[in-house]
């Protein structure tokens, strides 16, 4: 009989982001090593994991090793494999498939969130809230400056007009309705929009379909801590409705190689967009498209989690105003508009116009039923 190999077997690296993940198999454990090039981000991840494990199911962190130029975090490896193991895979179910597993998952996930949020919620000054995805990006030298400080982005194929700077004067039409949209004014407003106290709770902070495992567990902890509740809602909702099913796999297909069913679902989640200038004003028409699985997940999230949170912490129409800056940052602070195709750029611009409208309505924005949404 051949003796078992006493040495661990290290698999080919998986690259979902700029940090590489290496599967490791030993005689007793299935592990995954996360190699992080930023020591500060690694430190934040360790602290976030320590905080989260008291409230949420998370894989065990077994080791932390610091080497020159890298910090390596070694976690328990969850059963993530080809087209299975993530919420993403439940959302990739075809429209004629069975969505009962997704429905049960969403009920358990929202129940966990609701318990933790009501136990840990407090009105917090901005300095105590994780700032990576929102406040830090709005600060001088942050992502808004990096993306837009020197760009006046064209809105048609013609390079002369119209451009973003023209919108303060002309506005634009979205599906036949005129919207005022001052681009520079919006950026200026966002720079100070995260400097006031907010309702916050303990969370992972970046609740996307690739950061939620099946069976239920939370992954990726560098934004874990005390996060704005409105930011949490904006992140999950916009990622589920727009980014996760269409824009992210379109722009970063390498991250989805282990989940190829994602690509089959892109057509079902790709909006239709058309635009033309008329009398100096841009007219954009769009139609949202969303698979049944993603629509179900969004509906359950709002009915089972957002509605009770809104009733408790954002009564009346307060949720709309609380969401507005976080949603605006999700729209223009994830991808640089200048690097997108014209169709992608115009679609996000319509979403920004709807978000910044005086009568902004999450119900209309996410095409929710009235029973799913607590606001007008």
Q: Where are the regions a protein language model picked out?
A:
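Regulatory N- and C-terminal appendages and interdomain linkers associated
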Residues: 1-12, 20, 40-45, 312-376
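AlphaC helix (C-helix) of the protein kinase catalytic domain N-lobe
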Residues: 45, 49-52, 59, 236
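Active-site acidic catalytic loop and adjacent metal/ATP-binding pocket
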Residues: 13-28, 32, 185-231
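ATP-binding glycine-rich loop module of kinase domains
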Residues: 11, 17-46, 91-98
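Active-site activation/catalytic loop segments of kinase-like enzymes and analogous catalytic loops
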Residues: 230-309, 327-342
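Short pocket-lining segment of the protein kinase catalytic domain that shapes the ATP-binding cleft
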Residues: 49, 73-82
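Conserved HxN/HPN-centered segment at the entrance to the catalytic loop
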Residues: 53-68
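ATP-dependent phospho-/nucleotidyl transfer catalytic cores
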Residues: 88-111, 119-203
